[in-house]
């Protein structure tokens, strides 16, 4: 695998620097290097990224621009679905408190359906993807702790593993509450 550019960084490796405050162990950081060896280099980059995601490294640095951009976009879409589910569900639940009851269902029902749709789409497409456990790191201080000076790419994408259990619980709970509200409101509107 070393021929494909696979390198683990840890204490004592050539990737460390004296200015780092915290040394990273071999299980903390994985770098997908942009080394083209043959026709299927892109497939090899994707394979390495999959292996790194499944191995649950704390940091994954992606040098190949195309795969890094695709991964960052995929994570951004997942974040957008999560935030939309939470915000639309919150709007669904709190609109009846802010608007007159005669008009609140015009906003709360579509918001509830949107929340449920986003939560369902997230659950189907992102929940079991190992990428959903990662976020793109933009914080300069945290990035300075990583051995980025050893890279050949000037714009790598850095992923950091974060626990998403609370986030999933939040949007599932809000979407479920929005569903209950919508069913109750539809029953009241059409059964009476």
Swiss-Prot record:
Keyword Magnesium: no
InterPro entries, A to Z: TMEM11 (IPR026120)
GO cellular component: mitochondrial inner membrane; mitochondrion; plasma membrane
Membrane topology reported for the UniProt record: Multi-pass membrane protein
Subcellular location field: Mitochondrion inner membrane
TM spans (from-to): 84-100, 107-124
Any Pfam family hit: Mito_morph_reg
Major location (coarse): mitochondrion
Region (Disordered): 1-20
Keyword entries, A-Z: Membrane, Mitochondrion, Mitochondrion inner membrane, Transmembrane, Transmembrane helix
One of the protein's GO biological processes: inner mitochondrial membrane organization
Function: Plays a role in mitochondrial morphogenesis.
Protein family according to the UniProt entry: Belongs to the TMEM11 family.
Subunit and interaction comment: Associates with the mitochondrial contact site and cristae organizing system (MICOS) complex, composed of at least MICOS10/MIC10, CHCHD3/MIC19, CHCHD6/MIC25, APOOL/MIC27, IMMT/MIC60, APOO/MIC23/MIC26 and QIL1/MIC13. This complex was also known under the names MINOS or MitOS complex. The MICOS complex associates with mitochondrial outer membrane proteins SAMM50, MTX1, MTX2 and DNAJC11, mitochondrial inner membrane protein TMEM11 and with HSPA9. Interacts with IMMT/MIC60.
Name under which the protein is recorded: Transmembrane protein 11, mitochondrial
Source organism: Homo sapiens
């Amino acid at each position: 695998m070393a021929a494909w550019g696979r390198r683990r960084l840890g204490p004592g490796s050539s990737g460390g620097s004296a200015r780092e405050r915290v040394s990273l162990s071999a299980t903390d950081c994985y770098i997908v290097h942009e080394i083209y060896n043959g026709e299927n280099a892109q497939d090899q980059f994707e394979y390495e990224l999959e292996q790194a995601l499944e191995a649950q490294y704390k940091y994954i640095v992606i040098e190949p621009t195309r795969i890094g951009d695709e991964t960052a976009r995929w994570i951004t879409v997942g974040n957008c679905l999560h935030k939309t589910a939470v915000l639309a569900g919150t709007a669904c639940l709190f609109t009846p408190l802010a608007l007159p009851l005669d008009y609140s269902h015009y906003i709360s029902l579509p918001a509830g359906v949107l929340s449920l749709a986003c939560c369902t789409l997230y659950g189907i497409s992102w929940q079991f993807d190992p990428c959903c456990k990662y976020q793109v790191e933009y914080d300069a201080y945290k990035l300075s702790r990583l051995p980025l000076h050893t890279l050949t790419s000037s714009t790598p994408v850095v992923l950091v593993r974060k626990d998403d259990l609370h986030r999933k619980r939040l949007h599932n709970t809000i979407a479920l509450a929005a569903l209950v509200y919508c069913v109750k409101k539809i029953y009241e509107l059409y059964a009476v």
